[in-house]
């Protein structure tokens, strides 16, 4: 009976293997690193690169956007060190390395032509930084509620985020930590990743990100990357002055189409973007408000979102 109990516990705490330990997973190898990717649509259609949130998230929660494959070759990739991409030395996980990886993905799927790109949350931060560094590589860009783009919004983000938190939010973590001894380890990162994945999949309804009564679906995320979060965002949450990047640098050189999509319910939604980010963006930027929606409208309101995106990409 004890053996059966252990088996049941292990099954409930299994952590999905990365491409390093599961040869059946699709990947693209670029400069010696295997990024987990899933693509949808005809390869001859215009490529659309989808950049997920985090840092430390994965692309699974954005798969409802695969309906855009009717008109695009849609590329979802898990960023280095998170999702189902292999784990790496945490010191190599930086904002700049994330931008360099994005450049690898764009060059691989762009076939020497400008691509279309969509970034959500942290992914929106990366896209905005990328537009300033490589404006010629993108024809159409969509950014969805980037939390931090410069030192000013870093301070605002952290202040507002902490104001929305309660010590009760940390209680589930203890339960997850107590479960970690039962987790099998192959790459040495499963236990911390398990705790973070469970926290991300708690689907807490309402604020600070969603509308009242609204929550992400169960198991929206496949596997979090704790080191990515711990190395890139946690230091900023502890001390916002640690964020010294200016992701708006050279943004005026981007001449392509640009859509900012933000919600009415999220604490970094429409009003936040208008106050901290929109004044710095190019004149051609369109700002679309998702009324009665929250931060994850791409997942929870996929039909509306894809309709707006299709219109923008026309």
Give the ranges of each region predicted by the language model.
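Conserved HGGG/HGGXW glycine-rich cap/lid loop of the alpha/beta-hydrolase fold
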Residues: 33-87
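Catalytic histidine-centered segment of alpha/beta-hydrolase-like enzymes
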Residues: 293-302
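Active-site loop/oxyanion-hole signature of alpha/beta-hydrolase fold enzymes
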Residues: 82-118
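Alpha/beta-hydrolase
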Residues: 174-261
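Flexible "cap/lid" loop of the alpha/beta hydrolase fold
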Residues: 143-184
């Amino acid at each position: 009976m004890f053996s059966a109990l252990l088996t049941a516990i292990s099954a409930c705490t299994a952590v999905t293997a990365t491409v390093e330990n599961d040869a059946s997973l699709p990947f693209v190898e670029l400069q010696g690193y295997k990024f987990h990717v899933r693509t949808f649509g005809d390869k001859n259609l215009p490529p659309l690169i989808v950049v997920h949130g985090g840092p430390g998230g994965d692309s699974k929660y954005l798969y409802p956007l695969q309906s855009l494959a009717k008109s695009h070759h849609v590329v979802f990739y898990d960023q280095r060190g998170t999702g189902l991409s292999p784990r790496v030395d945490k010191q190599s996980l930086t904002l700049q390395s994330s931008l360099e990886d994005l450049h690898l993905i764009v060059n691989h799927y762009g076939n020497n032509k400008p691509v279309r790109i969509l970034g959500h949350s942290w992914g929106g931060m990366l896209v905005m930084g990328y537009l300033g560094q490589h404006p010629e590589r993108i024809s159409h860009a969509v950014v969805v509620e980037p939390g931090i783009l410069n030192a000013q919004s870093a301070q605002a983000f952290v202040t507002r985020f902490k104001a929305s938190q309660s010590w009760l939010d940390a209680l589930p973590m203890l339960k997850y930590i107590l479960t970690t001894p039962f987790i099998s380890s192959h790459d040495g990162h499963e236990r911390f990743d398990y705790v973070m994945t469970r926290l991300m999949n708690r689907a807490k309804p309402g604020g600070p990100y969603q509308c009242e009564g609204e929550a992400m679906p169960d198991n929206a995320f496949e596997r979090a990357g704790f080191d990515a979060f711990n190395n890139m965002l946690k230091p900023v949450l502890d001390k916002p002055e640690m964020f010294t990047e200016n992701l708006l640098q050279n943004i005026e050189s981007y001449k392509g189409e640009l859509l900012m999509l933000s919600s009415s319910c999220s604490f970094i939604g429409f009003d936040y973007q208008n106050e901290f980010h929109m004044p710095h963006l190019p004149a051609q930027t369109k700002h679309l408000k998702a009324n009665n929606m929250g931060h994850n409208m791409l997942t929870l309101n996929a039909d509306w979102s894809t309709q707006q995106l299709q219109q923008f990409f026309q």
